[in-house]
Amino acid sequence: MRWPVIILAVLVVVLQYPLWLGKGGWLRVWEVDRKLHEQREENTRLEERNAGLDAEVRDLKSGNEAIEERARLELGLTKPNEIFVQVPQKH
């Protein structure tokens, strides 16, 4: 009576090995699912960044307002008869 139980236990272990640890097993599926989730988050972040850059490019192509704004903010340029005042930030 003891040998059939041992044989069945060994058989169950042998049959379960590919399910849990083999190629396409649960551990591999879990790892692939985790990587898929990370990649989707990265894709979402990059899509948002691309949308912002696309909007900025369209603004720069369509009119002078965006160019003027960047020139004022980044280069400190002013219009004729305009005074530029810079207020230092408190630390």
UniProtKB/Swiss-Prot annotation:
<comment type="subunit">
    <text>Part of a complex composed of FtsB, FtsL and FtsQ.</text>
</comment>
<keyword id="KW-0997">Cell inner membrane</keyword>
<keyword id="KW-1133">Transmembrane helix</keyword>
<comment type="function">
    <text>Essential cell division protein. May link together the upstream cell division proteins, which are predominantly cytoplasmic, with the downstream cell division proteins, which are predominantly periplasmic.</text>
</comment>
<feature type="coiled-coil region">
    <location>
        <begin position="28"/>
        <end position="72"/>
    </location>
</feature>
<keyword id="KW-0812">Transmembrane</keyword>
<dbReference type="GO" id="GO:0005886">
    <property type="term" value="C:plasma membrane"/>
</dbReference>
<keyword id="KW-0175">Coiled coil</keyword>
<keyword id="KW-0132">Cell division</keyword>
<dbReference type="GO" id="GO:0030428">
    <property type="term" value="C:cell septum"/>
</dbReference>
<dbReference type="InterPro" id="IPR007060">
    <property type="entry name" value="FtsL/DivIC"/>
</dbReference>
<protein>
    <recommendedName>
        <fullName>Cell division protein FtsB</fullName>
    </recommendedName>
</protein>
<dbReference type="InterPro" id="IPR023081">
    <property type="entry name" value="Cell_div_FtsB"/>
</dbReference>
<feature type="topological domain" description="Periplasmic">
    <location>
        <begin position="22"/>
        <end position="91"/>
    </location>
</feature>
<keyword id="KW-0472">Membrane</keyword>
<keyword id="KW-0131">Cell cycle</keyword>
<comment type="similarity">
    <text>Belongs to the FtsB family.</text>
</comment>
<dbReference type="Pfam" id="PF04977">
    <property type="entry name" value="DivIC"/>
</dbReference>
<dbReference type="GO" id="GO:0043093">
    <property type="term" value="P:FtsZ-dependent cytokinesis"/>
</dbReference>
<feature type="topological domain" description="Cytoplasmic">
    <location>
        <begin position="1"/>
        <end position="3"/>
    </location>
</feature>
<keyword id="KW-1003">Cell membrane</keyword>
<feature type="transmembrane region" description="Helical">
    <location>
        <begin position="4"/>
        <end position="21"/>
    </location>
</feature>
<dbReference type="GO" id="GO:0032153">
    <property type="term" value="C:cell division site"/>
</dbReference>
